[in-house]
């Protein structure tokens, strides 16, 4: 190994900047920062069908469908203004030429993918679950005998009144909305089509095709009407409280939410979203009905990596006299192909609510830490997931000794050893934090008092570092908020978490900044938040997880209509066990809710916070790790970090643009060319076993795509990787500026 007196090679920042600007980017366009990329109309294509809790259930954008021997029940999502559900049940009962005289026998439904079939003798009654409604078909494999028009009689059962009918459509409804049946079409085996008609009398809908088309049709002959929901402008069948998680092995996100069907019913739905590399241009990955038939609300989702599954939890509003109205908690495992059984997580006459779950990204455990609020106290347990995707839980116990907790948050990315940080918001506006590991051992609770009351919070972490964003009342205001940030680190000695920094993240005087959500993107944290009151905007920005410093300029992702409430959630691919080097993006999901409609939208986001690729492992007994933060061309916050070295260890940082891979001192490989490298040091690691250097990046967009090599030397007199010089080497990184 080349011998150079390291202490003589102290770096001057102007020299670093000059050398940086003299480099040539090998592929500057490849690593340019990307604007937010839309996912596409994923939620506009929501359509699901599967067995759920013993029922064959389907759903589209604005309806639910159930299928049984009694027929197909179509329920429009009319929202909380409707006191009850108003379904329409359809069943083909007879057919014939010139009149419906031939009875259609009863039958049980069968299904494949999103199509339900009833075999009724030689006639097949089919329902295709589509996003916009049910497509009903009658398939004739034999030409019906006789003369005259082909008529199919469909029995209709509903509390809705007949509102309109003509030869093209029939509408059933009331003041809350209704159902429309229209678009009768005949199709033969050669693809020839003929427009039909329909009429309603008594309790029967008659579908009709002209005799001439029936006589000449190539078999099989299909008669196709279409069922869709009629949702008035004042309906409130909203999609609410979305949350998203990511699984690396599946290569998919799962977005969950709940839909209000009536004042006392709500369903839980899910939409898989492919990561870009597995889904191509079409990112929709399948839809699922997770819970149906109760008053289910506030869905939550977490990843269970070892099972290649997601765990979805929700709260059911229960009204059973003489018990008071309260909320119970339920959970089930979900994959793209399997829906696990529902497990009652917390069932009592008490009101359990505000549930949150942490993902488990390890491959050694299927335990997911779970917390909720009951009577102002926080309770916690561990959800277990078996190989058959059956959920269970361990004992439930109180996580706090004080009452008055109004919100609880837990880091959702899983992280190292299933180690998680929990944060509680008190009624007095303080934040309390506690460290939990995979077996629910915890350290003491710490309380953080703001200069003004905190009003909400969001949290994520990787098991060693955590990023917390909280809203705090603006100076002189009782309603407007700013957003502040705190970072926390894990100190192995004593199994403690310690706050490393607190700073303002978003502050616009006189403007409401609120509803933060956070996801770890590997080395950094992505923050999304809502800005504004009457007209609300959705902002997005990447921050370093060490000092809460911004890595890049904020992005305005979405602007809502006047009066629309914008609420977002985030998950990054790094949260599903992928590293910062392999993750491609994060998924941002939000609802735009105006009180009468609440559409879900999503956008893909690739943080331009630099690309760090390990090119050589470390050596020696200290196992210190090199990390790069905010390697962005706007990089005034660019940091080179050393983590997990002993407290007080002397270290030097080497940065070079040329690669040497020098060997000859034990197993160590010194990657940067030492003779042309810049050296920062010496410095000592802090009480949290970390060291860092701030290395600003100047030059603007002309430095995008430039790469340099980063490696640390750490003094080690006990087990040195390089005995001749008594030091260890950290892993070496190739860092590319974005």
Question: Which residue ranges define each predicted feature?
Answer:
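Extracellular, repeat-based ectodomains that mediate carbohydrate processing or recognition
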Residues: 24-66, 226-607
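N-proximal, solvent-exposed segments at the start of the mature chain
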Residues: 606-738
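Residues that cap or anchor secondary-structure elements
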Residues: 23-228
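Solvent-exposed residues in well-ordered beta-strands and their adjoining turns
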Residues: 68, 139-143, 155-159, 210-212, ...
């Amino acid at each position: 190994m080349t011998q150079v007196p390291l202490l003589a090679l102290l770096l001057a920042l102007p020299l670093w900047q000059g050398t940086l600007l003299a480099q040539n980017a090998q592929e500057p366009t490849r690593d340019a920062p990307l604007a937010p990329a839309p996912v596409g109309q994923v939620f506009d294509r929501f359509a699901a069908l599967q067995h759920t809790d013993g029922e064959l259930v389907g759903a589209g954008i604005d309806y639910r469908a159930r299928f049984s021997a009694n027929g197909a029940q179509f329920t429009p999502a009319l929202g909380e203004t409707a006191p009850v559900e108003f379904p329409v049940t359809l069943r083909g009962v007879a057919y014939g030429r010139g009149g419906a005289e031939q009875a259609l026998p009863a039958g049980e439904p069968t299904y494949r993918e999103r199509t339900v079939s009833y075999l009724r003798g030689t006639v097949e009654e089919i329902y295709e679950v589509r996003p916009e409604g049910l497509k009903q078909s009658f398939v004739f494999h034999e030409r019906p005998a006789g003369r005259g028009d082909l008529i199919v009689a469909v029995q209709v059962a509903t509390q809705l009144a007949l509102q309109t009918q003509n030869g093209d459509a029939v509408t059933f409804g009331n003041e809350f909305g209704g159902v429309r049946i229209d678009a009768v079409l005949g199709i033969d085996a050669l693809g020839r089509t003929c427009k039909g008609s329909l009429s309603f009398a008594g309790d029967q809908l008659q579908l009709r095709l002209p005799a001439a088309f029936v006589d000449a049709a190539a078999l099989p002959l299909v008669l196709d009407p279409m069922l869709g929901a009629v949702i008035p402008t004042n309906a409130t069948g909203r999609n609410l409280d979305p949350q998203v998680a990511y699984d690396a092995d599946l290569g998919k996100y799962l977005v969950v939410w709940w839909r209000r069907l009536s004042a006392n019913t709500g369903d839980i739905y899910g939409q898989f979203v492919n990561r870009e590399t597995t889904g191509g241009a079409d990112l929709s990955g399948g839809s699922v009905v997770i819970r149906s038939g109760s008053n289910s609300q506030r869905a939550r989702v977490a990843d269970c990596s070892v099972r290649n599954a997601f765990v979805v939890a929700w709260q059911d509003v229960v009204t059973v006299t003489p018990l008071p109205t309260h909320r119970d908690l339920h959970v089930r495992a979900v994959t793209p192909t399997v829906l696990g059984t529902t497990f009652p997580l917390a069932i009592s006459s008490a009101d359990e609510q505000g549930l949150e779950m942490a993902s488990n990204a390890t491959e050694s455990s299927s335990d997911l830490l779970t917390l909720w609020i009951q009577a102002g106290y926080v309770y916690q347990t561990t959800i277990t997931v078996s190989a058959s995707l059956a959920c269970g839980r361990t004992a439930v116990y109180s996580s706090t000794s004080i009452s008055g907790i109004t919100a609880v948050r837990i880091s959702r990315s899983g992280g190292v050893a299933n180690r998680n940080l929990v944060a509680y918001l008190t009624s007095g506006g303080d934040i309390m934090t506690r460290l939990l590991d995979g077996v629910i051992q915890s350290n003491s609770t710490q309380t953080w008092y703001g200069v003004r009351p905190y009003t909400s919070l969001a949290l994520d972490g990787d098991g060693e570092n955590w990023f917390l964003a909280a809203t705090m009342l603006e100076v002189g205001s009782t309603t407007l908020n700013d957003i502040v940030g705190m970072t926390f680190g894990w100190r192995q000695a004593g199994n403690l978490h310690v706050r490393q920094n607190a700073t303002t993240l978003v502050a616009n005087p006189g403007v409401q900044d609120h509803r933060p959500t956070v996801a770890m993107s590997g080395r950094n944290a992505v923050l999304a938040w809502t800005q504004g009151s009457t007209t609300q905007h959705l902002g997005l920005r990447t921050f370093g997880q060490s000092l809460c410093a911004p890595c890049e300029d904020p992005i305005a992702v979405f602007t809502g209509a006047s009066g629309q409430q914008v609420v977002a959630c985030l998950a990054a691919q790094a949260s599903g066990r992928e590293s910062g080097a392999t993750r491609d993006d994060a998924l941002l999901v939000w609802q735009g809710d105006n009180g009468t409609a609440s559409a879900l939208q999503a956008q893909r986001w690739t943080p331009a916070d630099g690309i760090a690729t390990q090119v050589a492992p470390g050596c020696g007994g200290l196992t210190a790790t090199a990390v790069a933060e905010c390697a962005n061309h706007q990089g005034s916050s660019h940091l080179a970090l050393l983590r997990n070295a002993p407290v007080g260890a002397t270290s030097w940082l080497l940065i070079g643009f040329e690669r040497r891979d020098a060997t000859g001192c034990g197993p160590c490989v010194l990657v940067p060319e030492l003779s042309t490298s810049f050296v920062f040091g010496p410095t000592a690691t802090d009480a949290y076993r970390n060291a860092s250097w701030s290395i600003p990046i100047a030059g603007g967009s002309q430095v995008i795509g430039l790469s340099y090599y980063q490696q640390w030397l750490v003094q080690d007199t006990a087990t040195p990787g390089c005995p001749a010089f008594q030091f260890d080497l950290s892993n070496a990184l190739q860092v590319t500026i974005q």
